[in-house]
Every structure is written in structure tokens, then in C-alpha cells.
Amino acid sequence: YDAMVAAYQNDFRNGFWHWTSFRFYAILAYMKKYNITQIVHVENDVMIFENIANITFHRPDKLLLTMDNEHRCVPGLMYIPNAHILEQCLFQFDHKQNDMQNWGNVYHIKDQPWIETLPIAPKDSPQKVSPILTNHYEHYNSIFDAASIGQYLGGIDPRNSEQKDTKGFINTHCDFKYHNYDFTWLYEGQNKVPYMKIPSSTGNLQIIKIINLHVHSKNLCQFIFPQHS
């Protein structure tokens, strides 16, 4: 650790892109040491609007992640079944690339047995996108936010822009164009939960739950609402 700090002190944000990959080795060490299985890893700017214990993942034996285009993974939320699978994935990493590129590359290894994707878009919509973005939607009847919804609704990291207000930001890397649709907040029990309004291919309006938001702006408070009495 100390050697990495010294080596990267002059890099972008003190080695930001190196640390984003290093975290997975730290998670691996933790899982091995304490014999931990079936964990959900979330970045600290990700808000989850569902009790994790109530989410039945479609393949509890595989590592599940979000891809926002054919080749890029945004690992803000990831289900990791066990240390063995995580380790096999990390063996494939090219440390000249960042974590988003590496996870995307591992996913695309021919006949790889370790990874499947979580849906970031519904299967039935006006947009035609890769099945990578919609696979297993029917299992959840909900979508996960890789990054673009949180960026659109809440803006981006202020360190990345000179604009004070970046709400409405459109992530051009993401193949699904969320800015074409409306969003609303509905109470589930005492808590408000985000939903996307999107027509089906036949024109019927779908109101689709969003399980998490990747709040890139780091301003999580804007999405914390008073509990419904």
C-alpha cells in the first residue's frame, strides 16, 4: 500500500485509476480471510432503494455487474458470489487499463464462465440496444443504474466540470438514452423510490422501478426525502 501511494502521488488524483482496480484485490483478500461469500459491493456514491436482502439475484453463482455499452462496465454496484470467481476474473486484468475496461474485457472473454450482466434498461422500449444492457430484465422487472441515470438526475462530480449545475448531464458513453424519458418518485411504504416512465414498443406506458442511483455528483442528500407517515 505505501509503495503504491509513493508511486502514484504524481498521477491523476494520486493514482485514481490504479486505486479503482486495487479495491477489488482488497475485497478479494477480505473474502478469503473471513471466508465471506455472496457480497454486494457498492461505491460510496451509490444509493440503493431496495433492501439488498430482498433482491433475489438471477445467478447467485456468478459475478453480476452493469455494462452501459457493449464494452464498458461501470462497477458501481456488483454482486460477487465468492472469492474464487473474483480471483479468476482478476487474473485476467491488464493493469495498463482501468477497471471499467478490464471488467468489460473479462466479460467478453469467449465462453467465460464467471460473469453475467444486470439490466440497465427494459427489453421492451423504443430504443434498440445490445442485449447486454437488457439481459435478465424479466427476472427483476426493474433496472439498475450503471451511472447515467444518476448523472442525468443529479449531475456529475463537480471536480469534472466548471459548471455549477450539471443536472441533465447526458453520458455519451451509455448506449441507452435516458434523457428521452421522464422520471418520477413514488412511495413504497415509508420511502420514496425512483421510477422511469417509458413507452413500450406498442405505445403503452411502462413505469419501471430503478433499484439504485449512481450519484456521480456525490450530493446524495438531494435524493433523501422525508419518510411518509
Predicted regions and their residues:
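Active-site-proximal specificity loops/subdomain of glycosyltransferases
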Residues: 1-32
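Conserved nucleotide-sugar donor-binding
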Residues: 73-89
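N-terminal cationic-hydrophobic initiation segments that often serve targeting/anchoring roles
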Residues: 28-32, 56, 107
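Conserved donor-nucleotide/metal-binding helix-loop-beta segment in metal-dependent transferases, i.e.
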Residues: 46-77
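A structural signal for short coil/turn segments at secondary-structure junctions
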Residues: 34-35, 59, 110
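Catalytic core and acceptor-binding pocket of nucleotide-sugar-dependent glycosyltransferases
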Residues: 87-229
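Short beta-strand-to-loop acidic/aromatic patch adjacent to the donor-nucleotide binding site
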Residues: 36-47
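Short aromatic/basic micro-patch
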Residues: 21, 79-80, 97
